[in-house]
Amino acid sequence: MCLSPATIIVFNRKALKKFGGFGGAADSIRNRSDLENLSEYVEYAADMYGWDDIQKYCLAVYQIVKLHPFTDGNKRTAGYVLLNCLRKRGLSYTGREKNLAEQIIELVKTDPGKKEESVLNFSYFIKSRLQKRDIR
């Protein structure tokens, strides 16, 4: 499952290894309970709102950057998680990495009271830049 705590931890470690960070992979988890509840919450909320899988993945990105479960690399981790979930669905993000990073940074800045609007806006951005992967 692309939103399991173990998968999210793997992507945080990859982000720290690739881009560096002050936390170090071994002690990077700041809030394990938020991380463990993330998948269940995202599934519940997406079902409650009637959201599709892309919107659900965007909610996961929002939750990762807002809950900040790691000492470092939360935004980078959220990006990796999103791209992995899309890949597992047979989709590729075709936009520029820089634009994706900017959109994730914008999520961090949003008012928590506008979570639904923020997630939907982010999902529209993502959906407009998706392509089915050619799997041979």
Labelled PLM ranges:
Residues 1-136:
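FIC/Doc superfamily catalytic core
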